[in-house]
Structures are given as structure tokens and as C-alpha cells.
Amino acid sequence: NLIQFGNMISAMTGKSSLAYASYGCYCGWGGKGQPKDDTDRCCFVHDCCYGKADKCSPKMILYSYKFHNGNIVCGDKNACKKKVCECDRVAAICFAASKHSYNKNLWRYPSSKCTGTAEKC
């Protein structure tokens, strides 16, 4: 769920998950246009992943995971829980890998500036 996702983000990036809650064109609710940078692209991919797991209620479902040697390990056998955990795990790793691209000017970015044709998932 979103709280667990936030905990993964904080653990992997050392930043508050709120730094990613309203960033670029895809971090936060909804999304349109072209991703603005690598960090925003992580959110685009995460949105696509949640879209594929939509029947699982990805924003609400509780799953199990742990941190092991600096990695996130998803622990559920349940297919829905595992799928959503994997979406969140991959995004948190992506944020950590793209920390260099984080641009404070893209936090609370106006959606009116999110233009261009959106890519397909």
C-alpha cells in the first residue's frame, strides 16, 4: 500500500517519501505528457505497473516485505500482493538509482506544463 511504498522509498533514498509525492508529471495522483527526468520516469513506470495490477487495489493492499542486505525482498505467495510489492520495490530501487536527477524545481510541478504525447506502458 502507499504507506509501505513510502517506507521503501525512504529506506532506499534516504529522503522523505513526500519528496516524491508531487513531483514532475507522474509522481502523485494521475499523470500525463512526457516524464520530465529519470525520477519522473520511475513514477511513469510505477503508474504503468499499478495499472496492470489495478484489480488488486494496489494503493490499499497490504503485503509483506523485508530489507535484506540493502535490498527489498517481497515475501507474499498471494499473486496480487506479490505483484503490488514488486511494483513498489522496483520503483524504490529506481528512485535510489536516479537520485542524481532529482530536481527540486520539479516538486509540485504544475500539471499544465505536462505536455506532449504520453508514452505507452
From Swiss-Prot:
InterPro entries per UniProt: PLipase_A2, PLipase_A2_Asp_AS, PLipase_A2_dom, PLipase_A2_dom_sf, PLipase_A2_His_AS
Annotated S-S bridges: 25-114, 27-43, 42-94, 48-121, 49-87, 56-80, 74-85
Compartments where found: Secreted
Pfam family, one: Phospholip_A2_1
Enzyme class, UniProt record, top EC level: hydrolase
GO annotations of cellular component type: extracellular region
PROSITE patterns: PA2_ASP (PS00119), PA2_HIS (PS00118)
One GO BP annotation of this record: arachidonate secretion
Principal cellular location given in the protein's record: secreted
Catalytic machinery residues: 46, 88
Cofactor: Ca(2+)
Keywords on record: Blood coagulation cascade inhibiting toxin, Calcium, Disulfide bond, Hemostasis impairing toxin, Hydrolase, Lipid degradation, Lipid metabolism, Metal-binding, Neurotoxin, Presynaptic neurotoxin, Secreted, Toxin
Binding site for Ca(2+): 26, 28, 30, 47
CDD domains: PLA2c
Catalytic reactions of this protein: a 1,2-diacyl-sn-glycero-3-phosphocholine + H2O = a 1-acyl-sn-glycero-3-phosphocholine + a fatty acid + H(+)
Tissues showing expression: Expressed by the venom gland.
Cofactor remark: Binds 1 Ca(2+) ion.
Similarity remark: Belongs to the phospholipase A2 family. Group II subfamily. D49 sub-subfamily.
Subunit and partners: Monomer.
Reported function: Snake venom phospholipase A2 (PLA2) that shows anticoagulant activity and presynaptic neurotoxicity. Acts as an anticoagulant toxin by inhibiting prothrombinase complex formation. Shows about 50% of the prothrombinase complex inhibition compared to CM-IV of N.nigricollis venom. Acts as a neurotoxin by inhibiting neuromuscular transmission by blocking acetylcholine release from the nerve termini. PLA2 catalyzes the calcium-dependent hydrolysis of the 2-acyl groups in 3-sn-phosphoglycerides.
Protein name (database record): Basic phospholipase A2 caudoxin
The organism of origin for this protein: Bitis caudalis (Horned adder)
Lineage: Eukaryota, Metazoa, Chordata, Craniata, Vertebrata
